[in-house]
């Protein structure tokens, strides 16, 4: 869990001191994911990890479809077949529905295909605002724009408990699943406070 300001500094250090490709992986749970990935891209990352739309956001990595829009606006070519991604996304929707009993989030993003759907002007501008904020290292404006983008598409809101405890997405969703099995969700907030 890394905020955009920190990844901006780290990318500059990595790129000036390492001779190997840099791969950035994060989760969206605390609200940093999309902004941190954009910051990493703007500051020269070689590879970013993403998820396909219906499995993205929340405790997962940012959606490749959103990263595709950012990269297109930045003139960065992705070596990804987005038509195949759209087909896979349809299958993943069905799979996620089948696994609903195990889904910690139970919130699906609004349907969207960046190859066929047109963004409203105000949402398209949010992508431009986020890019400008990432380039100028304005973390507050970057997170504001990214959170507005995620809200428009109905991705989960940042989880303040996770943000404060700095718990990775997978650890958080596993803990929630275990507490649900024990009928002990009432202790989640206290449990999160105990995590160093």
Task: Describe the role of every protein-language-model region.
Residues 1-196:
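Catalytic cores and adjacent flexible loops of soluble metabolic enzymes
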């Amino acid at each position: 869990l890394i905020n955009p300001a920190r990844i901006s500094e780290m990318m500059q250090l990595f790129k000036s001191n390492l001779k190997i490709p840099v791969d950035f992986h994060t989760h969206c749970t605390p609200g940093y994911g999309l902004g941190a990935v954009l910051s990493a891209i703007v500051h020269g990352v070689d590879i970013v990890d993403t998820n396909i739309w219906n499995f993205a956001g929340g405790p997962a990595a940012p959606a490749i479809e959103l990263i595709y829009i950012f990269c297109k606006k930045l003139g960065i070519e992705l070596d990804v077949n987005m038509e195949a991604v759209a087909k896979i996304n349809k299958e993943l929707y069905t799979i996620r529905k089948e696994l609903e009993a195990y889904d910690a989030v139970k919130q699906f993003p609004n349907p969207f295909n960046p190859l066929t759907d047109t963004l409203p002007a105000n949402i398209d501008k949010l992508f431009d605002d986020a890019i400008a904020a990432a380039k100028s290292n304005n973390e507050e404006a970057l997170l504001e724009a990214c959170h507005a983008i995620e809200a428009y598409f109905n991705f989960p809101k940042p989880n303040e408990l996770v943000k404060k405890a700095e718990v990775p997405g997978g650890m958080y969703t596993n803990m929630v699943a275990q507490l649900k099995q024990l009928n002990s969700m009432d202790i989640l907030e206290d449990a999160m406070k105990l995590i160093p």
